[in-house]
Amino acid sequence: MHLSDLAHPNELHGLSVAELQDVAKQIRERHLEVVSNSGGHLGPGLGVVELTLALYQTLDLDKDRVVWDVGHQAYPHKLITGRYADFDSLRQQGGVAGYLKRCESEFDHFGAGHASTSISAALGMAMARDRQGLDYKCVAVIGDGALTGGMALEAINHAGHMPNTPLLVVLNDNDMSISPPVGALSSHLNRMRLSPPMQFLSGSVEESMRHLPFMGGDLPPELNRLKESMRRLAVPKVGAVFEELGFTYMGPIDGHDMGEMIRTFQAAHRIGGPALVHVITKKGKGYPYAEADQVGYHAQSAFDLGTGKARPSKTPKPPSYSKVFGQTLVKICEQNSKVVGITAAMATGTGLDLLQKALPDQYVDVGIAEQHAVTLAAGMACDGLRPVVAIYSTFLQRAFDQMIHDVGIQNLPVTFVLDRAGIVGADGPTHQGQYDISYLRAIPNFTVMAPKDEAELQRMLVSSLQHSGPCAIRIPRGPGEGVPLMEEGWEPLPIGRGEVLRDGDDLLIVAYGAMNSKALATADLLASCGVQSTVVNARFLRPLDDELLHPLARRIGKVVTIEEGTLAGGFGSALTESLLDADIKPSILRLGIPDVLVDHATPQQSFEKLGLTPAQMAESIQGFLQRSKLTTATSVVQQPSVSVLES
C-alpha cells in the first residue's frame, strides 16, 4: 500500500507486519521531507510511527477515540487520516496545523498544544460513553515528560478508582520531553527501562527464543505469554506504581516492534477497566541526527536532510530576547548566589540552558509543572532567595491561582520572565502569548513591565531583582532589535516610569513592549502625511506612569495605544481606565488583538491579518483622527482589527 492512497485509517486493518513496516518507512520519509522544508516538530513524531500504526490496527477509527497529549507527536496520525496530500502546507497559513484541532479532522478527537491533558479528556469521553450506554474505545497517548504534569497524575488517580470504566493509557516512554524529564517518577520509569532483568528479557531471552530450531521469526502466543510471565517474575516492581493506583499495567514493551505492540494493545482492550501499556520508544527514530541529538531535533527550522544542519538565514539576525535574558541572568547569578533560575521543562526555549551549563547549582527544572514552579519560587522567596521563573506566556496561564494566592497576596519577591509573549507564529492559538497583559494587571502587588528592546530587558531584569515585591517581564519570541548590549553594570529603571521617544503636538501614541519599534515606524508614516506624534514607551503596565501620561493626554486630546496582546483588559484598557478615573476624556484608539483566536501563520502574516503593521496602523489612525473631528459624543466602535473608544 502506498501512503498517498490511504483514504481512511481503517484501511490499515488486515495488513501484515511487513506491510505495516513499509507504511512506517513511507511515513518517516514524508515526515522528514516536509519538516526539512517547512520546519516543525521532528523527533516526537519519528519516535511514534510504529506505535501509531500498531494502535490503529486495534481500533475502529469510525467510532473509537484517541487523544494525543500535546499533539506535536501526531504527524504520523495526520498522515494516515487524510492529510497526506496537504502535508506540504504544515504550519503555514491556511494549511495543516502543527497540533491537533477538532475543526481540522474528524479523527482529531481532542485539540491540544499544552501537556498533560490527554488522560483527563479520554476519561471524560469514557464516562460520557458509559453514561449514554454507547460502545467505543477511549485511548490516551501520553509521553513520560507530560506524565510529570500534575493534571495527568490527577487523572490517573481518578481513573484508577473507576474499575468498571474501560480506558487505555499508552505511555510513550522515550526518556525525553523537550529536554530530558526530571523528577522521581521519571527516575522510576528509567530504572524500569534499564534494569538488568528487563534488559535481559528484552534482549537475550527473546533472541534465544527466536533461534529455537522450531521457531520462525515472530514468537507464537504461547511463548509471548511465557515471556510476559518471566518479565513479571524477574522484575516484580515493574508497573507497581500504576497498579497501586488501580490500573492494569502491561509492559514495558518495545515501541518499534509492531507485532508485540499489536498483541499487547489487543490484550489491553479486553480489560474491563483502566489499563496502562508502557511502550519504550526512541525519539527521532530513523533519522540518525535526530537520534543522536534528541533535544536539538525536538523541533527544527528548515534544514538540510543530508547534513542535518539548519539552512542559513538569508540575513544575519540579532540574538533572541531569550538568549539575552539567559546570558544576563548567568552574569547576575555569578555575582549573587541567592539568585536562582527556575524553568518548567523549557530550559532551551527560555534561555535557561545557559544557566544550567554555567551554574547548575543555581538552576532548577521542575518538569512540566508550572503550578509547582510558581509556589516553589514563593517558598524560596520566603527564606531569602531571589527566584527568577522563566516560563512561556501561554504556559504560565496554568499557574494563575498560584501567582495570586502564593505570590501576589503575600507580596513575595519573585521575578517572572514570560517568554513568547505576543504573537508566536506557526504554533497557532494554543501557543500565542496574547493573554498575559490582561491577567497580570489584575494581580495584587505585582509590578508588570515589557522592554522595548533587549538592552531594556537587561535593565528590567536588574530592576526586578532589586524590587521588594513580585515582578513580571514579558518578552517576545525571536530576535531583538539589534541594539548595543552591556556585559555588566546595568542601571536599574525607576519603577513605574516611561519615556518619551518622540515629540509631536497632534497625537499621543503610547506603545507597550516590543510594539515600540512599530509605533515609531507608524509615527514616521503619519509625519509624512502632516501628523506629528508624541510616542511614549510605557515600559510599565503596573504601575502606569500617570505622572507622564496624564498631562500629555490632557494637552494633546487624541490618544492611541499599541500592544501585542488581547484588547480585552489589556494595556489600552488600563490606560483608558486611568485617564477616566482622573476625569481626563480624550479620544482614544486601542490597537491590539481583538476578540479572536490567532491561527498558525508567520508572525508577519498574523500582524497583517490583525491590522498591526505600521502601514495598517497609520491608516487606522488616520480614520480615527477624521472621526474625532466629526464627533464630540462618547461612543465605542469595534473594527475587525481595532477597538475604538472616542469621547
Swiss-Prot record:
Sorted alphabetically, which PROSITE patterns does this protein's record hold?
TRANSKETOLASE_1, TRANSKETOLASE_2
Q: Does the keyword Nucleotide-binding apply?
A: no
Its needed co-factors are: Mg(2+); thiamine diphosphate
The record's listing under InterPro entries reads:
Dxylulose-5-P_synthase (IPR005477), THDP-binding (IPR029061), Transketo_C/PFOR_II (IPR009014), Transketolase-like_Pyr-bd (IPR005475), Transketolase_BS (IPR020826), Transketolase_C (IPR033248), Transketolase_CS (IPR049557)
Give the co-factor note: Binds 1 Mg(2+) ion per subunit. Binds 1 thiamine pyrophosphate per subunit.
> Which residues make up the binding site for Mg(2+)?
D144, N174
Instruction: Give the metabolic or biological pathway.
Output: Metabolic intermediate biosynthesis; 1-deoxy-D-xylulose 5-phosphate biosynthesis; 1-deoxy-D-xylulose 5-phosphate from D-glyceraldehyde 3-phosphate and pyruvate: step 1/1
Q: Which residues bind thiamine diphosphate?
A: H72, G113, H114, A115, G145, A146, N174, Y287, E370
Query: Which GO terms of the cellular component aspect does the record hold?
Result: cytosol
EC number, as in UniProt? 2.2.1.7
Q: What domain of life is recorded for the organism?
A: Bacteria
**What keywords does the record list, in alphabetical order?**
Isoprene biosynthesis, Magnesium, Metal-binding, Thiamine biosynthesis, Thiamine pyrophosphate, Transferase
Q: Which reaction does it catalyse?
A: D-glyceraldehyde 3-phosphate + pyruvate + H(+) = 1-deoxy-D-xylulose 5-phosphate + CO2
Q: What class of enzyme is it?
A: transferase
Relate the protein's function as given in its record.
Catalyzes the acyloin condensation reaction between C atoms 2 and 3 of pyruvate and glyceraldehyde 3-phosphate to yield 1-deoxy-D-xylulose-5-phosphate (DXP).
- What quaternary arrangement does the UniProt entry report? Homodimer.
Q: What protein name applies here?
A: 1-deoxy-D-xylulose-5-phosphate synthase
Give the organism, scientific name. Answer: Synechococcus sp. (strain WH7803)
Originating gene: dxs
